[in-house]
Design a protein with these regions (language model features):
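Short alpha-helical elements
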Residues: 1-207
Length: 207
């Protein structure tokens, strides 16, 4: 049997983080369809992100609403901080027993083509100037993703580095105060900058 797109475990994680729906006035008549259940919306979001199907080509089915509806709720939940809180919860569960590799963090980026453009897109210098975005990711020593920033594809790798490190959440550990800085930050030549090195030394040692 195929693994469900939204398992019970995932849904139990996400549901408490979703904004509470507004209570409708029972004396007012509402036209149109009944709102989709949030779990169905999440199922459509996960399907689109896993397959890469454009939102406008994702049809409404018995499993999820239309792609445009899923995209609208994805953005709404993003603005509400749902995904950030989910990440912090998961990282905290790893940090409490000491499973976050704070001895070093590795930063890197990858460009992704975005044919239709939009926010955080720009001409890619590595893809014949086609429009795209760049994903900047910071992971711990074991490859656990700690933070991610999205920029236009024509932004330099090092531009969001300080913001990426500063955005790390304070995570509880086995003892002492919560921690949010790795001992060392490592990157390739694209991150070689004396100014950034000095800034990072205030809280961690770059390589």
């Amino acid at each position: 049997m195929a693994e469900p797109l939204v398992s019970e475990t995932l849904w139990r994680r996400v549901e408490p983080l979703l904004p509470k729906p507004k209570v409708r006035n029972r004396h007012r008549q509402y036209a149109g369809r009944k709102p989709s259940h949030p779990r169905k919306i999440l199922r459509g979001i996960v399907f689109a992100l896993r397959t890469g199907v454009p939102w406008e080509y994702l049809p409404a089915t018995s499993e999820w609403p239309s792609g445009q509806t899923c995209l609208r709720w994805l953005r709404r939940w993003q603005r509400a901080g749902v995904w950030k809180r989910l990440l912090v919860e998961l990282l905290s569960e790893l940090a409490r027993p000491g499973k976050i590799g704070w001895e070093r963090a590795i930063v890197d980026s990858a460009s992704v083509r975005v044919p239709h453009g939009g926010r955080n897109t720009g001409p890619s210098p590595v893809d014949r100037r086609k429009r795209g975005s760049k994903h900047h990711v910071l992971v711990d020593a074991q490859g656990v993703p700690l933070e991610l920033v999205l920029t236009a594809a024509n932004r330099n790798d090092i531009t969001p580095l300080l913001g990426l490190v500063d955005a790390l959440p304070a995570l509880p550990g086995k003892r002492g105060r919560p921690r949010k800085r790795p001992d060392r930050v490592q990157g390739d030549r694209g991150y070689d900058s004396e100014r950034h090195r000095q800034e990072l030394k205030k809280g961690s040692s770059p390589s």
